[in-house]
From Swiss-Prot:
CDD domains: ABC_ThiQ_thiamine_transporter. This is Thiamine import ATP-binding protein ThiQ. Part of the ABC transporter complex ThiBPQ involved in thiamine import. Responsible for energy coupling to the transport system. It is found in: Cell inner membrane. Belongs to the ABC transporter superfamily. Thiamine importer (TC 3.A.1.19.1) family. It holds the Pfam family ABC_tran. It comes from Shigella flexneri serotype 5b (strain 8401). InterPro entries: AAA+_ATPase (IPR003593), ABC_SmlMolc_Importer (IPR050093), ABC_transporter-like_ATP-bd (IPR003439), ABC_transporter-like_CS (IPR017871), P-loop_NTPase (IPR027417), Thiamine_ABC_ThiQ (IPR005968). The lineage of its organism: Bacteria, Pseudomonadati, Pseudomonadota, Gammaproteobacteria, Enterobacterales. The complex is composed of two ATP-binding proteins (ThiQ), two transmembrane proteins (ThiP) and a solute-binding protein (ThiB). GO terms for cellular component: plasma membrane. The gene is thiQ. Residues 2-230 form the ABC transporter domain. Keywords: ATP-binding, Cell inner membrane, Cell membrane, Membrane, Nucleotide-binding, Translocase, Transport. GO terms for molecular function: ABC-type thiamine transporter activity; ATP binding; ATP hydrolysis activity. Its EC number is 7.6.2.15.
Length: 232
């Protein structure tokens, strides 16, 4: 279980403060206007930002000050952060060993994830030789191969066309279910959120303004629907 208790980040002395509980294996969408604090929330969970106050626990262990490299969390950004001089296999392998010295079991795990992502025939290629969708599959594979209990997505598929975005969302949801991973996904699209998350959190002005069923947001009946421009 992920639990944030009054986690606070001072943005130009304006406090952004979040309290949130997410159960193990749950898939949650994080929605809200631009600049509301959605990415800040993910970066606090991942450890890329150090909170001014509050606490963060994962499965009962305090990770409030744990460095990002030691947190049981993986994060995928819109900019996939692949290394252009490394092959697909090497980029995925970094998720297992930064020195790329993989044993037989790690090699098999890497190839199994690549097959799951449908990129096992691209392992010798460089990122520059791939399409945008293929690069995001590689970046996702690198996250999944780490087998961390929490996966954070910061709009990684927003630049893809609608059909490809739908394909990637389905792939993420299925993979998280198979690995029993907790998923938190930032999105500007309630429709995308509804595809993989039954529960949504709406962030506004550096606070969690609402949380509940995604379908309630879509219907326009939720108190936070208006924040997203949805009317009943």
């Amino acid at each position: 279980m992920l639990k944030l208790t009054d986690i606070t980040w001072l943005y130009h002395y304006l406090p952004m403060r979040f309290s949130l509980t997410v159960e193990r294996g749950e898939q949650v969408a994080i929605l809200g206007p631009s600049g509301a604090g959605k990415s800040t929330l993910l970066n606090l969970i991942a450890g890329f930002l150090t909170p001014a106050s509050g606490s963060l626990t994962i499965d009962g262990v305090d990770h409030t000050t744990t460095p990002p490299s030691r947190r049981p969390v993986s994060m995928l950004f819109q900019e996939n952060n692949l290394f252009s001089h490394l092959t697909v296999a090497q980029n995925i392998g970094l998720g297992l060993n930064p020195g790329l010295k993989l044993n037989a079991a790690q090699q098999e795990k890497m190839h199994a994830i690549a097959r799951q992502m449908g990129i096992d025939n691209l392992m010798a290629r460089l990122p520059g030789e791939l399409s945008g969708g293929q690069r995001q599959r590689v970046a996702l594979a690198r996250c999944l191969v780490r087998e961390q209990p929490i996966l954070l997505l910061d709009e990684p598929f927003s630049a893809l066309d609608p059909a490809l975005r739908q394909e990637m969302l389905t792939l993420v949801s299925t993979s998280c279910q198979q690995q029993k991973m907790t998923l938190l996904m930032v999105s500007h699209s309630v429709e995308d959120a509804a595809r993989i998350a039954t529960r949504s959190v709406v962030v506004a002005d550096g606070r969690i303004a609402w949380q509940g069923k995604t379908e309630e947001l879509l219907s326009g009946k939720a108190s936070a629907s208006a924040i997203l421009g949805i009317t009943g």
